[in-house]
Amino acid sequence: MIPFITPHSAKAMPPKLFLALALSVPLASQAVEMDWSGFGTVGYATSDQPYKYQRFIDNQGTLTRDSVLGGQVDLKFSQQFGATIQGKLAPSDKSDTQWDGTLSWAFISWRPMDDLLIRLGKFRLPFMLNTENSDVGATYDFARLPVEVYSIAPTTDVVGLSISKSLFTDPMEWNLEAYTGKAETHWRYYGREIRDVRNSPGSWFIPVDIKSSGLVLTARDLDNTFRIGIHEVIAERTDQPVHADIPYRSIPVGPNIGFYDLTKGRRVDQLIIPVQTIAASISLPANFKVTTEYARIKVNSASEGLTRWGAYLAVSRRMGDWTPYVYYAKVKSPDSTLEKYKTINENRVPSSPFYNANLINQSQTLAADIVAPFDQWTGAIGSSYRITPTSLLKAEWSHTSTGVVSSFVDAPSGGDSANKQINVFSVSYNFTF
């Protein structure tokens, strides 16, 4: 009955599959070289509101939102062949109360020429500038990557094939990467009054099969990075067809009485979801850096609020071991979708002996939650402090203001997420070893 919402990490590639890939590599006569490393973040976040924001943050404080522990092994079989395995322990992609161990990377690589790299297996997708290294907090200065942008990718990793070609020109290095692959992931919903099969508020997670293909061009030198990408995602539910709309159904007991019916409507087997991204990180005099990223996605389903754009602009300055920064981020669904959400959310039927008005009215709240729009902005100020070459201490204060609705907010029963003001304080220790 329910379509889609916010994506989370894909499942780990089965170990037997990776073993089969590794055994297919023609080993050289010399011994295999192996390097290993680890990474982690211990992050605490608290807000000034009693309801959850970004799944975990409220005024009780949490270590769950940003904490992660992981490790990586790099194998070099020869000058041309290698393999990488990266695993992590982090909050589950299918539960708000559990932690899971998963593989983020598990691929073999072949470099037939210095400027050509082929990877086969599980790998992170080159969506935004920090998507591939988002779990390694020591590699960027933000206490938390702007959710307005980094939540847009329908999945962050796939099992498949990646081919990248590099071109070196003075002073830039150009890299063109084409990829295709599949993922099994879960997308999250939150119901304010009722959820999919329970007559109580809460979250639920829908299993989704994804096929993703894309072409990404990246240009960089020692100080600057530019990226543009086009992606096509094919998503389908594993248990039933996807509802493409939520039709209005009149009740013949009086004028203008009816409801939006979740049990009816056009259904499709899969969704074709285009995604476009563009990003730049530019170094300026006096150790200033300007970073901006933009992403856009279109989803033609009952969850039409997932169609949205997100962007942010950040300015930072390195001052010795300190790197203070400020950023402004915004995410917004189309105005027509926000109006549809308001119409469904405000729709009510009067009491009548001919139907259960309470059940119908609860279903309208659920239908509005399923539309799942976004309308919010965030301003943040923070800093990182480099304790050692491999560890960072970060602190950040952010203020989020919602408009018509924000599906990042688990709104309390009897209310909604409109016109909310949320202050979040975050502190974290980030390390590699």
Tell me the role of every PLM-derived stretch:
Residues 86-103, 150-153, 194-210, 301-307, ...:
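Outer-membrane beta-barrel proteins
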Residues 33-39, 43, 60-186, 213, ...:
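Outer membrane beta-barrel
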